[in-house]
């Protein structure tokens, strides 16, 4: 009788443990759903253009991080702006209540923000992770290399010719161009927390160059602290910001 009871208890524990374990397909679909529904987070965005024909001072772009929410787009970002021969300057940028504020070289400026949420500092627009065509790749687990570290599972898009061509297609769709690449490297990652069954982090990087240009372009970004409560506060000195004139069409 004791053996029967033990056998029943063992069987029950196995069933329960099986029920609590989440399948790969289930995690991928949860990642897809939560990515589509993201509202905010701590963003890091890097955009660098390097001229391989110039030995030194050959890079321009930006490297910024901070809080950002998507609807409507608002952010508070700090970092650096790189200007080739002119070196690096601190970059402090805010978008709040439809007005864009920027501090460069200790001077504050402001102008009307975008009405369509499109901005160089909009992670949702810049990140290849958040585009529908990329999210659709989550429907097939064979597209992904999977690694586990404690409660965290990382889904990393595989490096195959077929998937590279797909990533190029997605990238070009946003560029609205179809360049011929001499170099194209990509990393697309989603990190999922199996303990709280929540999406934990997004990461992407694309390095691209064409045979018709000496320029190599790197775009990279991370989004963490997903759906955090964000309230953008403007620095007191931003009240002295000078109005930037809009460019005439």
What is each model feature region?
Residues 1-7:
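Positively charged n-region of N-terminal signal peptides that target proteins for export
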Residues 11:
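Nucleotide-cofactor and metal-assisted catalytic machinery
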Residues 20-249:
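Subset-of-secretome marker
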């Amino acid at each position: 009788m004791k053996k029967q009871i033990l056998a029943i208890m063992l069987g029950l524990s196995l069933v329960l443990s099986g029920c609590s374990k989440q399948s790969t397909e289930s995690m991928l679909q949860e990642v897809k759903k939560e990515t589509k529904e993201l509202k905010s987070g701590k963003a890091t965005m890097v955009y660098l253009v390097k001229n391989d024909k110039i030995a030194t001072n050959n890079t321009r772009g930006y490297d910024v991080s901070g809080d950002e929410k998507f609807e409507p787009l608002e952010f508070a970002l700090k970092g650096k702006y790189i200007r080739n021969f002119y070196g690096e300057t601190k970059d402090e940028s805010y978008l709040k209540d439809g007005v864009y504020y920027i501090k460069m070289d200790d001077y504050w400026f402001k102008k009307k923000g975008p009405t369509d949420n499109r901005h160089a500092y909009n992670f949702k627009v810049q990140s290849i992770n958040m585009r529908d065509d990329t999210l659709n790749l989550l429907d097939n687990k064979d597209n992904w290399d999977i690694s586990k570290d404690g409660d965290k599972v990382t889904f990393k898009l595989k490096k195959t010719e077929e998937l590279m061509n797909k990533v190029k297609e997605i990238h070009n769709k946003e560029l609205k161009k179809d360049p011929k690449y001499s170099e194209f490297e990509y990393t697309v990652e989603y990190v999922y927390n199996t303990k709280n069954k929540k999406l934990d982090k997004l990461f992407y990087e694309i390095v691209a160059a064409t045979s018709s240009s000496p320029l190599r372009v790197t775009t990279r970004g991370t989004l963490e602290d997903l759906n955090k409560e964000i309230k953008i506060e403007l620095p007191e000195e931003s009240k002295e910001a000078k109005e930037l004139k809009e460019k005439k069409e």
